[in-house]
C-alpha cells in the first residue's frame, strides 16, 4: 500500500514531489515543475540552465564549467582530463600540446615551399627539479613555436622533454621564433647546454644526398671529429656515448674515390642491418627518409643554436661539390659570418680561420 505524504490517502499513481510521494490531486493543487534531468516534480523555484528546466540539486550536480575556457557543460558530455572537466575544444588543445609518449609521432606535415629538401630539429631540454607539470611548459613553448613542432618524452631526461619539428625547408625552419621559445624555457628554469645528457640533433632529408655525397660528409665528420666535438660543446665521453665516430681513416695510398666507395659500402650495410645500437653515431644513417647529425650538444643560446644549424646545413650542401676530401676550406665555404666568428671563438678549424679569444 502506498499513501500520499500530503493527504494521507492511498494512491495508485506515484508522483515524486520534493523527494516525497504525492497523489495526483495533491500534485495538481501544488505549484510545481518537472525537472528535465531527474524526472521529478519540485515545488521550489525552477532554474533554466542551458535551455533545461532543472531543480536545485541537478543544477549543482549535473553541470560543470570547463576548467580552461569556463564554458558551462552537462557533466555527462564533459571530458575528464586528469582532474579537470573540459569541453571538447579545450580537451583537444591539451592533447595537442601535451608531451607525447616516446615514438608517438604525429602524422608528418611539411612546412615551407621546398618539399624535397627539408630539415628537422630535435632539441632536448631538462629542468633541475620536477616541480610543475611538464605538459604546462610544453603548452607554453608550443604556443610560441606553432603547429610545426611538438614535444616528446625522452628516457635520458629527468624532468624535461624533447622539442621536435615537423619537416621544414631551410627558410621555414630558421623563421620559427626560436629566440622567444628559448627565453620562455630559460625563464622557467629549463636548461640544455648545462646538462650532461641534452643534445641537439638535426635531420636532413635523404633526397639531398647521393650515395657518394653521404660518404663524403661522413668522412668529413670522422676526419675532423675532435675539432667538431669542441665546436659542438661535447666532452669526449659524451660524444662517445651519444654520437660516436666511425673511425674511417685513409689507408696508405688510398685515393679519395676508393675511400668514398669503402665508406659508402659500409653505410649501405649499416642501413640494411637497421640495428638500434648503430643510431648512436655522429652521422646516423639507419633511418629511411633522413640522415641524422647527432654531434651537437643541446643549447638555449640562440646564437649558438643558429651557428650549429648553419654548420650542419653548410657541410651537407658542400658534400655535393667538394673535390678534395681533406681540404677544409672547401668544406666550410659558405658559412655565415656569425658562424665563422663562433668557430673562431671556439678555436676550431684553425687551419682555415684565424682564431681569437672567446668562450662559448
Predicted segments, located by residue:
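Short cysteine-rich clusters marking metal-coordination/redox-active sites
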Residues: 4-7, 23, 35-38, 55, ...
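Terminal catalytic/cofactor-binding subdomain
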Residues: 67-71, 79-189
Amino acid at each position: 500500500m502506498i499513501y500520499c505524504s500530503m493527504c494521507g490517502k492511498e494512491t495508485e499513481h506515484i508522483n515524486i514531489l520534493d523527494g516525497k510521494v504525492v497523489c495526483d490531486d495533491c500534485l495538481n493543487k501544488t505549484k510545481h515543475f518537472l525537472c528535465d534531468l531527474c524526472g521529478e516534480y519540485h515545488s521550489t523555484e525552477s532554474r533554466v540552465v542551458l535551455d533545461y528546466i532543472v531543480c536545485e540539486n541537478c543544477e549543482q550536480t549535473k553541470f560543470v564549467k570547463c576548467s580552461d575556457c569556463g564554458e558551462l557543460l552537462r557533466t555527462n558530455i564533459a571530458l575528464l582530463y586528469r582532474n579537470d572537466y573540459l569541453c571538447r575544444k579545450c580537451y583537444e588543445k591539451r592533447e595537442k600540446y601535451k608531451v607525447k609518449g616516446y615514438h608517438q609521432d604525429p602524422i608528418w606535415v611539411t612546412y615551407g615551399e621546398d618539399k624535397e629538401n627539408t630539415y628537422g630539429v630535435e632539441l632536448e631540454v631538462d629542468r633541475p627539479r620536477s616541480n610543475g607539470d611538464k605538459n604546462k611548459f610544453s603548452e607554453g613553448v608550443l604556443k610560441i613555436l606553432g603547429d610545426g613542432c611538438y614535444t616528446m618524452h625522452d628516457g635520458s631526461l629527468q624532468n624535461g622533454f624533447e622539442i621536435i619539428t615537423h619537416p621544414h625547408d631551410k627558410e621555414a625552419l630558421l623563421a620559427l621564433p626560436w629566440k622567444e621559445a628559448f627565453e620562455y624555457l630559460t625563464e622557467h628554469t629549463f636548461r640544455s647546454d648545462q646538462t650532461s645528457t641534452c643534445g641537439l640533433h638535426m635531420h636532413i632529408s635523404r633526397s639531398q644526398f647521393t650515395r657518394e655525397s653521404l660518404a663524403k660528409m661522413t668522412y668529413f665528420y670522422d676526419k675532423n671529429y675532435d675539432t667538431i666535438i669542441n665546436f659542438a660543446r661535447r666532452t669526449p665521453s659524451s660524444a662517445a656515448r651519444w654520437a660516436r665516430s666511425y673511425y674511417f681513416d685513409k689507408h696508405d695510398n688510398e685515393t679519395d674515390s676508393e675511400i668514398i666507395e669503402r665508406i659508402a659500402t659500409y653505410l649501405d650495410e649499416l642501413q640494411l642491418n637497421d640495428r638500434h645500437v648503430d643510431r648512436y653515431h655522429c652521422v646516423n644513417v639507419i633511418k629511411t627518409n633522413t640522415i641524422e647529425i647527432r654531434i651537437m650538444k643541446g643549447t638555449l643560446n640562440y646564437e649558438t643554436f643558429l651557428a650549429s644549424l648553419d654548420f650542419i646545413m653548410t657541410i651537407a650542401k658542400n658534400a655535393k661539390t667538394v673535390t678534395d676530401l681533406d681540404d677544409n676550406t672547401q668544406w666550410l665555404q659558405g658559412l655565415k659570418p656569425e658562424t665563422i666568428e663562433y668557430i673562431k671563438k671556439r678555436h676550431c678549424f684553425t687551419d682555415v680561420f684565424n682564431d681569437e679569444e672567446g668562450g662559448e
